[in-house]
Amino acid sequence: MSTLLIKNIHQLVTCDDGDRVLQNADIYCEDGFIKAIGTALDISADEVIDGSHMLCYPGLVNTHHHLYQVFSRNLPQVQNMELFDWLKTLYEIWKNLDEDVIRLSSLTGMGELMKHGCTTCFDHHYVFPSHSGDLLGAQRSAARELGIRLYMSRGSMDLSVKDGGLPPDSVVQTVDEIMADSVRCIEKYHDDSYGAMCRVAVAPCSPFSVSAELLRQSAILARQYHVRLHTHLCETKDEENFMLQREGIRPLEYMARLGWLGDDVWFAHGIHFNDEELRLLARTGTGVAHCPISNMKLASGVARIPEMLALGVPVGLAVDGSASNDGSSLLEELRVAFLLHRLHASRQAPTGYDILKMATRGSARLLGRDDIGQLSVGKCADLFMIDSRRLELVGCDQDAGSVLGTVGVRGPVDYTVVQGRITVRQGHLVTVDEELVAREANNKCRDYLANV
């Protein structure tokens, strides 16, 4: 039995059903779960942390990433491109992915996430070059090394350039190949138990890079195995025009006809929904992963988050891939989301606390998890803490629930705890040799890009 006790926490932001913020509270964790929250708990533990100056929050939950893109960030040739041209250029790099690239880029990306308070990462991996090996296995290995909670996906593409899609032939597969490997990945890696450290979703890339048959079969398979469905949707006007030209209908109607609505489905981006479509999402419980930094960089537009929240559309927060974000900090995403919607919606904009809830409870809902996203007894012991004595936080004690949005935290957090295990201490990863990972990843990245 492993135990952790954090004593006398300055402010504990629970994000629970009562939105409680507790002062001078203790939190006791046992075998990965929260067993007690209170004051002056008379309990011994394997490790005791003094929380007397700490702001404590539920671990952040990232609902959309492309970890393999860590090795293609800050590339000058794509800095001023919009989505379709950006993708066509980068596919020429991504077609060289292998297990080493996936393991090291995943260690880097998830390590960066964890250093900034993220305890659960969903990754949308859809590029499977022929003879590239077990890419999801490499990603699972990286997550285990770090100690982060991972939600993988068996993504896919079956339409190459010759079929009217965007990717080259070398990274697409047949529907039969994709379905067979999706079953393999679910049966090998998916754990549906409470507190699971690894789950798997079925996640075709996007309606402009996969066939209707693949989308239809993916929905059937996911429901047969009781796993979730994810894809990109309504990210750009180019996508909307592409679907209108090819199918004669808008993207969401197309997906609805193929079985892609429901509380087991969430879409990345969701920028270009009209009023009727927003109401449809709300009625069906279909979710949206909000990726503000990526949307700004690729000039994709601004998602209608205030309207979504008002209607009851499930919304979570996400960093998106490191090639369109150039980083993996959900803390940064949180503050950008707060500021972006202040600019566009003023009094209707989400508060700093609303965005925190989006990145915790909201994100957990998208992933179908009621065991993470809040600090309450019986939930997973996933949390992070920030020392309130930091220079940049002077004078910020009045509203601990909103401060991550209104003021922001730009450096690593002081502690991250996943499943009751300390994974970040004083801003540094403790489960891996951070300097060694960075050195190996940089060397591999240089070799990878040199072969393009």
Language model: regions and residue ranges:
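N-terminal metal-binding scaffold of metallo-dependent hydrolase/deaminase domains
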Residues: M1-I43, M54-L55
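C-terminal cap of metal-dependent C-N hydrolases
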Residues: C15, C380-A438
